[in-house]
Amino acid sequence: MIEVVAGIDAGGTKLAVRVETLDGTRLCDKEFPAEDWSASPVDTAATWLRERLDRAVPAGYRMLAAGIGAQGCDTQKHCAELETALAEQGLRAVVVNDAALLVPAAGLTEGIGVISGTGAIGVGANADGDPLFAGGWGWVIGDEAGSAGIVRLATVAALTAHDEGNPDDGLLSSLLRAFDVDGPEALARKVNDEATAENWGPHAPAVFTAVEDGSALAGEVVGAAADHLAALVRRLVTRGAVGKDVVAAGSVITGQPRFEAAFRARIGTAFPHLTVTLLEDLPVAGGVALARRHTGNA
C-alpha cells in the first residue's frame, strides 16, 4: 500500500483534512462539520478524529502519520494526552493547538501565529521549543479580535452611547439591521438570549460596514480589536517567543482590510523586527508539514 501523511485542522465550525503522498502529491482536501468537536475527553476526541480521517483517506493508501491542529488543546500536556489516545487507536500523530498550524503552513520553522476568526488566539514557542499561548479565552470573556468578540464590544459601545443620550452615529442602526430588531432593548435581548459565537460572529461585518459609513464609535471598536490582537503578540514576545514572522489567519483579518492594516500598524510600531504575513494556504497545510517532520520526510 502507498504511504501517505495527513494534516487535520479541527476548528470550532469545521474540520479540514488534507492527505498527501510522501512525494507531495495531494490526494484530497475535505471538510466535515465540526460543531460537535471537543478536545475533551481525549479518548472521545481521538475516536472522533480517527473516524473522519478514515473517511477522508482514499482506499488503497496507508496512513503513516498525521499532524493535527486541535481547537481546545491549549496546553502541552493536553496535546500529549490526545497523541497518546490516537496512538492507542493506531494513529501516529503530532498534536498542537490549531493556531500552531499557521507557522508551518507558511513554510516556516519558527514564528508567531495569530488567528482572528470566530475567536482570537496567539501561539508561539520559546527557544527550547516549548509552546506559548496567549488569548483564546472564548468570546464571552475575551477574544476581542474575533468576530464574536467584536460584536460583543460593538453592542456594548452602541448601547452605552444610547444610555448616555448620544445620537446614533451609525453603529447602533447597523447592528439593529444585522440582528433584525427594532430598538436598543430588543438588541440587548437578541444578543443575550443566545450568547453563542453562532449568534454573534456572523454579524461582525455590520461593525465594519458602520466604519465605512463613517461611524467613529465603530472605528473605536475596530481599533480596540486590533489592540487586542497586537497585545497577544506582545505577551508572547515578552515570554520569549522566537522568530521574526507573525503569520495571521482567520476570517476577520483576511476578510477585513481595514482591520488587517490596523494590526500591521500596531505591530510595525511596537515590534519593527517582526514581519506580518497573511497565510496564503489553508492552515491544514501546517498539519501536513508537521506530519512530514514527524516521519522524517520534511
For each feature predicted by the language model, list its residue ranges.
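Short beta-strand-loop/turn "lid" adjacent to the catalytic site in phosphate-handling enzymes
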Residues: 31-38, 54-94, 106-107
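Glycine/charged-rich beta-loop-alpha catalytic/anionic-binding loops adjacent to active sites
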Residues: 64, 86-93, 129-138, 266-275
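Conserved phosphate-binding catalytic cores of ATP/NTP-utilizing and phosphoryl-transfer enzymes
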Residues: 1, 91-114, 130
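Short, acidic/turn-prone active-site loops that include or flank metal/cofactor-
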Residues: 31-37, 99-100, 118-120, 137-140
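Hydrophobic alpha-helical segments and helix pairs
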Residues: 111-160
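Short, active-site-adjacent cap segments at secondary-structure transitions
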Residues: 74-76, 101-103, 121-122, 253-255
